[in-house]
Each structure stands twice: as structure tokens, then as C-alpha cells.
Amino acid sequence: MQTTDVAILVPAFNPAQGWSRQLLDEWECFRKELGDMSWSFILVNDGTTTADFEQELSYLLSEEPSIQIIQQPVNLGKGAALRKAMELARANIYLLTDIDFPYTTESMLRIINELHNGSGADITAGNRKKDYYKKVPWLRSQLSLFLRWLIRKRLHLPFDDTQCGLKAMNEKGRKIFLQTKTNRYLYDLELMVRAVAEKNITIKPVPVQLREGILLRRMSFRILFQEATNFMKILLFRNRL
């Protein structure tokens, strides 16, 4: 695969109806801001079961045939999907985001420019402001805040917002990402724990903001139980370092 300036990596699992048009609209805005930077775009279908997904995917590719598709027949989780994309991608900067491009174009540019402009960062991680939690379901916001507290008190990381879905990294960051084992949502946390343990990796939090009108999903109790188990695994891994 040809090396590009930026690779955009996006997982997809049962996205909302009309996702393809929304993705194209947001992608068009972002692509214009990339200017003359070369890009690649990889979308991973992580075992989607909705009836209209293939139809929407066909429309997406008819409008933007350069997007590469990875098909996973069963749902393995966001972390597993992004690792699959990361294995295929070749770029100077790898940008991770969600299928609805929930963060503003300015936020995405800020994330990659901190790497592109030679700030010394290897991984840039979105840092969500307090008003973010007013825009998400109550239970999800409380769980996110509780996780941030746990990260400060139990994992002792230099920053507590590990779960923002908007991140970017260079090749050094990519190599650490490919070492992660967590398949679902807490892959971010494992990535940060591994990166902090490396002496030659620099992580920079970057302020980001949600787009207006974004509605985030509620989490099922099954997923919450799985993530609690994953947190304990990551905690044990951290304690062994």
C-alpha cells in the first residue's frame, strides 16, 4: 500500500440510517482543509447486521471510490477493527475517528497538525471539555467521569481523558497501537498505558469539541460488564510494568 501523509481509520458497527451521506458531507469538509496533503481512508465493517448497510456502503463507494473497505464477518469490537485498519495502512500520520465524524473539522485538524508541524508528539489524544458531558446520555457521562477518576487514582497516568474517540499518531505510535490486545472500547486506555511506559514516546492532549447535533449511543450492560473486565486486565498489566 502506498504511503500517504494522512490515513483516516474508521470503524463501523450498525451505524445509524443515512450514515453514508453524513459521512460524505463531513469528509468533504475535512478533505478540503487537508489541502495538498495526500490521504488514504480505510473503513472497517465490524460485523454490521443492519439490513441497509450494504446499500449505503455501495452509495459511499460510488461517491468516494478511493475509500478502502475491510469486511469483518463478525463483530469483534472497536479496538480489533482499528488494529485491522492499522495493519493495512501506511502513512506518516494515522487519524482515528468514528463513522459519524462527531468532532469538529477544527478539532481533527488540530489533532493532526500537532504531529504534522513537528511539535515532538508521537500520539495526540483528544481532550474533551466539561460541556461534552452535557451532550451525552446521563449514565454514559457519569461512567466516563468515573473512569477518568479511576485513571487518576489507580493507573496514575499524566492525563485522565483516554477515551476520546479522536486520536492521531505517527509510526512510533502505530507500533505501540499494534501491541494492544483489548478488542472493544478500552483499547484507548491500553494504548495510553503502553505508551506512557515507553521512555521515547511523547503523548500530547489536544482540546477537541463535538459538532452540534451529535447524539451518542447508550451503552448496554453487557458491554459495560465486558469493559469492567478489560479494565481489570489493563490494571494488572499496568501493575506489572
Predicted segments, located by residue:
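Short aromatic/hydrophobic "clamp" motif used to bind/position activated sugar donors
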Residues: Y94
